[in-house]
């Protein structure tokens, strides 16, 4: 190995990072009330707000990234289903 290639390999270390990810969806949920008018005569429905999902990505090169996603999407389910 020449001196130039030895210096190059020292200045550019091999990329041996490995990543692991942990994901949790709908860790908690919030359900609010019922609405019998929107469902007609088949019974009440409910609005739901999905809970916050947490996504954590850990990089073994001493980098830690944490991403918290708050979903503001509202879903409605009717008692007729």
From Swiss-Prot:
Which Gene Ontology BP annotations are present?
sorocarp development
Could you tell me which residues belong to the region Disordered?
1-31
Please give the start and end residues of each transmembrane region. none
Bias (Low complexity) occurs at: 9-31
The family annotation for this protein states: Belongs to the hssA/B family.
What is the name listed in the Swiss-Prot or TrEMBL entry for this protein? Answer: HssA/B-like protein 3
Q: Which organism is it from?
A: Dictyostelium discoideum (Social amoeba)
Q: What is the lineage of its organism?
A: Eukaryota, Amoebozoa, Evosea, Eumycetozoa, Dictyostelia
């Amino acid at each position: 190995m020449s001196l130039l290639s030895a210096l190059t390999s020292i200045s550019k270390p091999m990329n041996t990072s490995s990543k692991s990810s942990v994901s949790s969806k709908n860790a908690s949920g919030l359900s609010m009330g019922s609405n019998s008018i929107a469902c007609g005569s088949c019974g009440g429905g409910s609005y739901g707000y999905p809970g916050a999902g947490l996504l954590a990505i850990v990089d073994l090169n001493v980098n830690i990234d944490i991403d918290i996603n708050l979903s503001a999407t509202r879903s409605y389910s009717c008692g007729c289903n």
